[in-house]
Structure formats: C-alpha cells, structure tokens
Amino acid sequence: MDHPHPSTFSLGLSQILVCLALLYAAIHILSVYRRLCHISGPFWARISNLPRVWWVNTSRAHEIHQQLHEKYGDVVRFGPNMVSLRNPTWIPTVYPTRMGVKKSDFYRTLAPYTPSGALPAVFSSRDEEVHRGLRGPIASLYSMSKVLPLEVFVDRTIDVLVRQLDGRFAGAGETFDLASWLQFFAFDVMGTLTFSKRYGFLEKGMDVHGMLDTIWRFLKGAAPFTQIPWVDEIWNKNVLATKLKGATGVSILGIVGKFVSQRQEESKAGKIDGTADRDMLSLFMEIQKNNQLPPWYVTAWTFSNITAGSDSAAVVMRTVFYNLLSHPSTLQKLRSELLSAGPLTQPYPSWKDVCNLPYLDACILEALRLHPPFCLPFERIVPQGGMVLGDTYFPEGTVVGMSPWVVNRHKPTFGEDSDVWNPERWMVSKELKSKREAAVLTFGAGRRVCLGRHIAILELKKIVPALVLRYDFELIDPERFTTENFWFFRQRGMDVRVKKRMQAEAGI
C-alpha cells in the first residue's frame, strides 16, 4: 500500500493554511466594508487605510480631501472605519463641550516617545481624565485677561525683528524670504513668553541649533502614521524600536529639558529676576509645585508651547502677509484703517489701539480660515449609542473627523469664492459674521479647543500693524510661494524686498 510522501502532505497543509488565511481576509474585508456600506467614498478607501497614507505622503492631502467632498458630498468614507465630514453645523455634535466623544488613536502618533514611554501632552492626550489633569491647572493662564499682560514680551520681539529688517534689508534692497523671518519671529516670541529669553533666530537670521528643522522632521515623519496608528506602535513607539532607532521626539524634548533644567537650577540658586517670574515656565513650575503634580507636567506644558504654539502662529502670519502683498487693494485698505485709527502708541501700536479695528479683524479671520495650521481631520470616536448627523447614522466606534481646510471652505457658509482671499466676507452683518466665525475650525472646537488661541491672536494683531505701517514690501514672484501639508501646514518661497515707509522714517 502506497503512503503519501511527507513533502506532499506538507504542501497540502500549506495550501490549506493559505486558503484559510485568504478566507479570513475576505471575510474581514467584507465585514469592514459592510459596516459603513451606506456611506459613499473611494472604493479602495472602504477596505483599506492605505489610500489615506498615500494622500498624506503626497503632501497634498488637504486638496485631495476637498476634491473627494466635492465629489461625494458632506459625508465621505476615507477608510474602513473612518468618515470625513464637511458641514459646519455638525461641529457642536462632533466636538462637544461635554466629555464622552474621545480623540482617536490618530493623536497617539503625535506624542513624543521617550525611553520611559510616550509623554502625554494637552493636545495629544486621548484619555479624558489625563487631559483634564493636564489642562485644568494651566487653563486660566491662556485666558485673554492673563495673556494681555504678556504684550510687553511681544513688543520686545517686534523690536528685534524691526532692527534686523532695518539693518539687513531695508537699506540694501536685498531679497530675502519673509516666510522664514516670520517663523523666526513666531518662535522667538514663544521663547520670550515661555522662558523670558529668545532662542536667537532673529539675531542670527537662521535656524538656531536646527530646532525648526527638528520639529518639522518629527511632524513630517509622524504624519503618515496618523492614518495607521497601529503601525506606529510597531515601528516607532516600543522598547525595541527605541533601542534600535532612538526614541521619536527625544531631540525636541532635549531642547525643552535643557531650558527647564536651567530654570530649576537658577531657581534653587536664587538667580531668578522679576522678569523671569512673569514668564510661563515660572508659572508652570509654580503650578506644578503648588498642586503637587509630577515634574513631567512642566515638560509636557512647555513642549506644547514650543511646538504647536510657535508653528501654528507662523502659518497664519505668512498667510496674512502673502495675501496682503498679492492683493494690494486689501493692503491699502488695511493701512488706511490703521492710519485713521487715531493716535497710535509708538513705536508699535498697542493691543488697545487695534483690537477693535474691523478690517484688521477681517484680514486675520480670513487668514485663519484660508490656511489653517492643521490640515488633516480632527478625529473623534463615536460614543456608545451611535451618532446621527443629518440623515446619516454612525455606529458606535466609528471614527469621524472634520478637516479645518475642508470645513473652512464650505461654500454654503462662506460663499462661492471660499477658495480665495477675500477679507470682505467678514465685513457683513453681526449675525452672519458670528455664524461664519463659529464655522471656522482652525482652533478646533468644544472642550478640546486650542488653549493658545488668544496668544496667537495677540501676536497677529501686534505684528501685522507694526510691519504694515513701517514697511513697503515687494513680493518678487508670487508663483514661487509653495505649500506642503504633513498634518502641520508649511509655506515657503515668500521672497521680498523691503523699504521703510516715509511715515516710519518721520516717526509717524
């Protein structure tokens, strides 16, 4: 009697295992597909997250997302369990002020990972109790009443920028990239607010110690993993990966840790002066001590100030100036409003001088709307009981999200010209303006709204009048202006020439 050859048996077993694996995969894909089959979207996005990863890798995900919404409507399936939303009236439901609608694993990838594990931060924390513990003690520091006394720090940094522009460029007719200098300003402002000292970007006219490049590389590297967070756990955020490749975010935390350690040593030695006592790091340390919180809280708070606080303000500053220079009529209207505002504080207009100027407000709102710093959907997990938006039901566990880039261009809300710069859209009735402001998702919404939004507005309403009144900028080639989106939005190529205006020369 013949017996089956062992190799034949092995081959048969292998074929069975392959068939079982394929059957399991087919059942899984069908199950995933059917769960949200009532929601339209690209075919491959219904069964895999790989299209989302590809979109992010192109650096044009924001434009792809907008095109998909134009094709499929307000509700589009971006992944097997991820749905993108566009209608601004749904913002209060997706981002409520109450607890219960949690952030997705998207944010886990944005937390810097150290040899001791991931560092929780106000922005990236998904656990609502952890978030409340981090945000609660410092929330009052970011209220407008607490932010306004920091105006003196902004003025000092404006003064440094002005001296650099006057000394390097205004008299020489030399071309320079205004985008870079606005980023230098934004980072030095946050350095001054946080540590009572600038990083030195403005004085040196360069990326000091590669800080800006380090932060950008961290964000750019994390962006694709936001679409497939489980891969990030395998590839980056575990003990083995840390030993082999080094921990993600360590270089940024090293910068933060250096400043924090230096301040702690100065405090112990009694070397803190009255100015330093007013900066945010000193306040963070005082809050941590008074509330008996772990020391890493100070690091987490400071990390958020340095990264999100600086880069996001720089994006909006560049948007304001690029569009003012590209649309001279709006620049002239803004300058006329500033010159007609009455006696202005010298050498730079104060917050009180400009806080209620309608066209300045319109230009800043339009910049916040047109180019938000964050251009991927803010993801949330549908809670128990599901969620209904319009006539669409979303089962529990579905990930939903709204992209500021897409929502801020909602034509029924902002007009048919929502893709272009038009500050006049804000020079409307109080009711319509309020409706549109509520639809701008740039700072997020609900209980996770951006803590630093008042600081950003203070910076913008200080730097824009100061530069518009003092200088005439000539944009060399508007076509050289480029953008890229890796979660954070970045603009480059704002080559300009600058000269002082006659009124500035006369001290008016």
UniProtKB/Swiss-Prot annotation:
Pathway where it operates: Secondary metabolite biosynthesis
Residues annotated for heme binding in this entry: 450
Topology in membrane: Single-pass membrane protein
Alphabetized GO MF terms: heme binding; iron ion binding; monooxygenase activity; oxidoreductase activity, acting on paired donors, with incorporation or reduction of molecular oxygen
Named cofactor requirement(s): heme
Effects seen without this gene: Abolishes the production of aspernidine A, but accumulates the intermediate aspernidine D.
A Pfam family this chain is assigned to: p450
PROSITE patterns: CYTOCHROME_P450
Compartments reported by the entry: Membrane
Superkingdom assignment: Eukaryota
Record's signal peptide: none
Membrane spanning residue stretches: 9-29
GO cellular component annotations of the record: membrane
EC number: 1.-.-.-
Keywords, comma-separated and alphabetical: Glycoprotein, Heme, Iron, Membrane, Metal-binding, Monooxygenase, Oxidoreductase, Transmembrane, Transmembrane helix
CDD domains: CYP57A1-like (cd11060)
Main location: membrane
GO BP, sorted A to Z: secondary metabolite biosynthetic process
Coiled-coil region: none
Family from the record: Belongs to the cytochrome P450 family.
Protein name in the entry: Cytochrome P450 monooxygenase pkfB
Gene from which the chain derives: pkfkB
